Amino acid sequence: MNIFVTDPDPVKSAEVLPDKHVVKMPLETCQMLAVVYSKWYYDWGNDLLPKKDGTPYNTEKGAFRGHPCTIWAAQSIANTAWLIQHGFGLLEEYTHRYGKIHSCQTAMNEAERVFEEKTGRTLLCHKEATPFAFAGPDVFKYDTSIDTLTAYKRYISSKPWAASNYLRDPSKKPNWL
């Protein structure tokens, strides 16, 4: 579970991620949002976000509720909006690279609907998000000479597979990789 934040703009942050992240991060985003919406944080309901088969994400045990990124997402409505926008960015990028709709599309649509219904705000409030949490190796986490965005870029760059994982659209590979 993580949010690989490489840019303050949630869509731009999604656009530069490797193929592997574009495939798996929408699911992690939906799982995180389900926990944030559940009794563990906002208490909007435990069965609001449907998986592709229509069943809700299981939030009863609150898996990952203590993860730094989940805590960050729940710290403010703006942070939650940022995560939803990032999720949509990931879904758009998935469709661009793979030519099909990700199985998390329905859950993300519902996440936006519930967010707007419960808060009375649109996702544009994501611009008010607080500084991002970093969940990664200590070598990046405790490097006080870099910010969180740079830490995530270096974390991604440290993966031996990352630089060659833009097979679907090599033009998306960022210059920092």
Each PLM stretch: what is its role?
Residues 1-66, 70-177:
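Sequence termini and other peripheral, non-core segments
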